[in-house]
């Protein structure tokens, strides 16, 4: 399946660059525990058929690369993770060019665990298009 392949090549590239300093998730984790940090999740949302060309099977989705750290870390530590470890890897992901057509940065959001106060995250987002 194309979605699984997209996530896999990105996780492989991140794991190759970052190493075992992080736990990697194929999809957004439903639960994180104290020993799970730092964590990096790669997932897709809003995947839909574009309908731009007749007889084409072109899709678009939002690709998320979300870094999770302990709740008490400042946003600057999340920025450091994104800017020095994650973002540079995404400039050239081996094998990704054969899976997607375009990849455009959308920005990123900060989030906090409001329920358990265990984690904080930075969610880097890209708009991607691809043929199924």
Swiss-Prot record:
Disulfide bonds: none annotated. Pfam families: Phage_tail_U (PF06141). SUPFAM superfamilies: Phage tail protein-like (SSF143749). Keywords: Host cytoplasm, Late protein, Viral genome ejection through host cell envelope, Viral long flexible tail ejection system, Viral penetration into host cytoplasm, Viral release from host cell, Viral tail assembly, Viral tail protein, Virion, Virus entry into host cell. It is found in: Virion; Host cytoplasm. GO terms for cellular component: host cell cytoplasm; virus tail. InterPro entries: GpU-like_sf, Phage_lambda_GpU-like, Phage_tail_protein-like_sf. GO terms for biological process: symbiont genome ejection through host cell envelope, long flexible tail mechanism; viral tail assembly. Belongs to the lambda-like tail terminator protein family. Homohexamer. May bind to major tail protein and /or tape measure protein. This is Tail tube terminator protein. The gene is gene 12.
């Amino acid at each position: 399946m194309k979605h699984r392949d997209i996530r896999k090549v990105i996780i492989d590239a991140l794991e190759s660059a970052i190493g075992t300093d992080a736990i990697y998730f194929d999809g957004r984790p439903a639960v994180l525990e104290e020993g799970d940090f730092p964590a990096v999740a790669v997932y897709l949302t809003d995947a839909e058929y574009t309908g731009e060309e007749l007889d084409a099977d072109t899709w678009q989705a939002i690709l998320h690369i979300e870094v999770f750290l302990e709740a008490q870390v400042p946003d600057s530590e999340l920025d450091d993770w994104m800017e020095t470890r994650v973002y540079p890897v995404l400039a050239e992901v081996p094998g990704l060019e054969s899976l997607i057509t375009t990849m455009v940065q959308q920005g990123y959001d900060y989030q906090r665990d409001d329920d358990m106060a265990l984690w904080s995250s930075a969610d880097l987002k890209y708009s991607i298009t691809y043929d199924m």
